[in-house]
């Protein structure tokens, strides 16, 4: 529902100026190489409709999603850039791929044959990018297992009716790891990818477009594969567009976090010594303690693992530890050190000056920033800001 108003309960502020800044930083690092902006998982929880608009305005060459539904959402929103589906598409939807000019990943001969037959029944041609598995071990033609067979299958795909091969790509498994063994593994993946490209070219099926770099790849190896192939190349950044480094080992410090998660204080009360708060009575006051209840919980994406002092929330510029267990829809913080806190005051769950960052939360909960961002649920409105002004709100409930 398009609007610029929303209920101040819990919301995610999306800084589109930061998003633009990040895109430009990646573009500069890539040396002018075309960029395929990854907007899967609703732009890592930020909202793909608005984020894709910004990327298009900034000169993105492609958009990448995970599934057909995500691609159709973008088309329905008026996005006209080429779209690549990185994952699986049921062959029965070939007509949608054709009609909406959406490119599918092709990762096995049986999948390609099924898609070919469906495309013929639909009376059109599906554009495909061949997916090479150089060591990720997910979908893709298994080059490490049997290179010659994988190439033969790719070449057979190129002859199937109803399909048009327009690209070749792969995905690095450990480009974000600086361990010597993993650095060598990334190099092996890259060389195997180049070998596959050259084999296809030698057989008369040179891919018109080639892409292999993810976020870590484009920052560490911006000349891959453009320095080694004659085809058009592009980079495929993801997490760095949203302001986060690929890993603790690979950090650049050039990006601005785009999301800030906020809520409000619903009640303030004083706990006396011996009184407790939340389920399980995991926190019992030893001294008089002022407690603020906040309008958010793990159902919104604030991890329950941040219970009992692990999470730090910002209220009036003061860091406030979480008290007791995080509930489904509410959590409590210690605001004893916060002067004049009252109901309706804003609290920053992550992304503030003294609150946790999404990366802090990832470390504390033994995960990655990607999961923290994607975990913000759909009942949390996304509030889009440009130049400090709200320009749009996406609320999936209203």
Located regions from the model:
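Active-site-proximal beta-alpha core segment in soluble small-molecule metabolic enzymes
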Residues: 3-6, 10-13, 18-21, 31-209, ...
């Amino acid at each position: 529902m398009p609007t610029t108003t929303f209920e101040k309960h819990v919301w995610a502020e999306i800084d589109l100026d930061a998003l633009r800044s990040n895109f430009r930083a990646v573009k500069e690092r890539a040396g002018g190489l075309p960029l395929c902006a990854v907007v899967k998982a609703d732009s890592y929880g930020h909202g793909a409709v608005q984020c894709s608009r910004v990327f298009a305005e900034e000169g993105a060459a492609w958009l990448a999603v995970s599934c057909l539904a995500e691609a159709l959402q973008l088309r329905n929103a008026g996005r006209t850039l080429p779209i690549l589906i990185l994952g699986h598409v049921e062959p029965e939807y070939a007509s949608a791929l054709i009609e909406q000019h959406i490119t599918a990943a092709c990762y096995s001969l049986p999948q390609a044959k099924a898609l070919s037959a469906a495309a013929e029944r639909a009376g059109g041609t599906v554009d495909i990018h061949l997916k090479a598995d150089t060591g990720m071990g997910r979908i893709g033609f298994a080059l490490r297992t049997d290179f010659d067979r994988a190439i033969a299958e790719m070449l057979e795909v190129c002859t199937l009716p109803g399909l048009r091969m327009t690209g070749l790509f792969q995905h690095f498994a450990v480009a974000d790891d600086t361990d010597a063994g993993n650095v060598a593994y990334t190099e092996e993946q890259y060389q195997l990818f180049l070998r596959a490209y050259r084999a296809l070219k030698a057989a008369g099926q040179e891919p018109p477009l080639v892409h292999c770099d993810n976020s870590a790849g484009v920052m560490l190896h911006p000349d891959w594969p453009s320095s080694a192939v004659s085809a058009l190349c592009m980079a495929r950044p993801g997490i760095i567009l949203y302001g986060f480094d690929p890993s603790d080992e690979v950090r650049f410090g050039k990006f601005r976090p785009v999301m800030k998660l906020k809520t409000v204080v619903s009640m303030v009360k004083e706990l006396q010594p011996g009184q407790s708060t939340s389920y399980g009575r995991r926190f019992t006051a030893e001294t008089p303690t002022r407690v603020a209840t906040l309008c958010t919980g793990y159902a919104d994406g604030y991890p329950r693992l941040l219970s009992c002092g692990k999470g730090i929330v910002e209220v009036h510029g003061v860091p406030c530890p979480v008290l007791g267990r995080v509930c489904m829809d509410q959590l409590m913080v210690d605001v004893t050190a916060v002067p004049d806190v009252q109901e309706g005051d804003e609290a920053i769950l992550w992304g503030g000056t003294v609150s946790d960052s999404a990366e802090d939360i990832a470390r504390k909960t033994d995960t990655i920033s990607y999961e923290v961002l994607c975990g913000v649920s759909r009942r949390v409105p996304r509030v889009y800001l440009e130049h400090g002004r709200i320009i749009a709100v996406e609320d999936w409930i209203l």
